[in-house]
């Protein structure tokens, strides 16, 4: 666990300075330096530890652990599993990302209702999310593994095509699509660099750096959360957790990151 708590205090202390920093190349450099400084003691480790405990603990009406959950590489295999997700699962006859697969395992193995399994998908500062902890634990087991999301099954190809369509679909009060904010290099909103997600390098870096511990929120955030929040920025209706649309969009982004080593849980401002 190293000095996570001390690092957390440091991060909080650094935050106001960051908010006041002027936009410009200097800011980007500062944020990068600050990321580097925190990289050896990411508070995400606290979520990982809690997630490991949740994975192993007997829970739900059936009082069994998740250790027999098949994330795609065989029952209980966690190492490298995230680097090949989303993918098609024959037992559910659909494409699933990590979260929808975990919900599936909570329902089938542990006997939870869907409502219980999807309760509080994202933490809110005072109440932590079990789902985000599980995601932190499992994704950490793919650190360094090269992304290799499959397009073998017809439903995997369908999900990719649907995700691509959603990415370029314009609508809402501002007539925005994801591409409006994410298809040009060098764009920035306030202090934040906007990755060009249609360009391989940016797409790889963006996808492989989630989940991330968000210093500004004191929370670990998953890719499902990232997409939920970008739907909000786009003034679209709320993206339903583990919905077909969220999985398809994840498939599009994850597949476009193929070839890059997975590098999360990361740390972000
Ligand atoms: C109104 C502009 C806007 C729209 C539209 C938008 N985003 Fe974003 N997106 C952002 C901003 C701003 C950030 C950076 C947020 C931050 O750093 O806090 C971001 C970050 C991201 C990231 C993480 C990048 C990284 O390197 O960490 C991903 C992935 C992403 N958006 C995907 C999407 C997808 C998919 C859509 C369409 C559903 C979308 N965005 C729509 C503004 C937008």
Spans of model-derived segments:
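Bacterial N-terminal signal peptides
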Residues: 6-16
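Positively charged n-region of N-terminal signal peptides that target proteins for export
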Residues: 1-4
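Sec/Tat signal peptide C-region and signal peptidase I cleavage site
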Residues: 17-21
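Short, charged low-complexity linear segments at domain edges
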Residues: 36-52, 144-164
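Hydrophobic, well-structured mid-protein blocks that either form specific transmembrane helices
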Residues: 134-141, 150-151
């Amino acid at each position: 666990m190293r000095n996570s708590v001390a690092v957390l205090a440091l991060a909080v202390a650094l935050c106001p300075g960051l908010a006041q920093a002027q936009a410009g190349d200097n800011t980007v450099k500062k944020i990068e330096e600050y990321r580097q400084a925190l990289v050896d003691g990411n508070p995400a480790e606290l979520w990982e530890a809690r997630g490991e405990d949740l994975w192993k603990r007997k829970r739900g009406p059936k009082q069994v652990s998740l250790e027999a959950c098949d994330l795609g590489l065989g029952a209980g295999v966690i190492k490298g599993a995230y680097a090949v997700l989303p993918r098609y699962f024959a037992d559910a006859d659909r494409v699933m990302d990590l979260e929808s697969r975990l919900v599936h395992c909570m329902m089938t193995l542990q006997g939870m209702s869907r409502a219980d399994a999807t309760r509080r998908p994202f933490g809110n500062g005072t109440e932590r999310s079990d789902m985000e902890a599980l995601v932190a634990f499992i994704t950490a087991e793919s650190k360094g593994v090269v992304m290799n999301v499959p397009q073998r099954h017809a439903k995997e190809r369908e999900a990719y095509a649907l995700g691509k369509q959603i990415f370029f679909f314009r609508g809402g009060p501002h007539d925005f699509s994801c591409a409006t904010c994410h298809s040009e290099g060098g764009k920035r909103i306030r202090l934040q660099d906007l990755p060009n997600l249609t360009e391989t390098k940016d797409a790889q870096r963006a996808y492989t750096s989630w989940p991330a511990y968000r210093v500004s929120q004191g929370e670990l955030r998953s890719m499902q959360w990232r997409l939920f929040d970008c739907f909000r920025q786009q003034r679209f209706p709320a993206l339903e957790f583990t919905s077909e649309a969220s999985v398809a969009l994840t498939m599009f982004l994850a597949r476009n990151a193929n070839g890059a080593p997975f590098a999360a849980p990361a740390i972000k401002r």
